[in-house]
Swiss-Prot record:
Inducing factors: Expressed in the early phase of the viral replicative cycle.
InterPro entries on file: ASFV_fam_110 (IPR004848)
Task performed by this protein: Plays a role in virus cell tropism, and may be required for efficient virus replication in macrophages.
Record's signal peptide: 1-28
Glycosylated residue positions: N62, N116
The name this protein goes by in its record: Protein MGF 110-5L
Family: Belongs to the asfivirus MGF 110 family.
Top-rank taxon, per record: Viruses
Keyword annotations: Early protein, Glycoprotein, Signal
Amino acid sequence: MLVIFLGILGLLANQVSSQLVGQLHPTENPSENELEYWCTYMECCQFCWDCQDGLCVNKLGNTTILENEYVHPCIVSRWLNKCMYDLGQGIDHVMVCSQPKYWNPYKILKKEWKENNSQN
């Protein structure tokens, strides 16, 4: 019985350590160690991309897209296990931080870049 209890306790401790913890005041620039979390569930946020000369490279996966309305300024925050993306103009997404859900209202605007694409 004690072995089962300790096993369950160990699983819970492991789960908690892999989740984002604490409060994050609203920011357009989450820390480098949180980018993977925030950019996985809404990749259109501007802080997920390095844009130069009309092209944007994803900071996590090296995907390259044409710079357009797909890349948006986002404000992210975390409070009491609620994670929030605010895209402005009343567009926001709130989720339970420990049970995140992908959301991307701008996915139709994403234009992947290939070497033979023109930017016209």
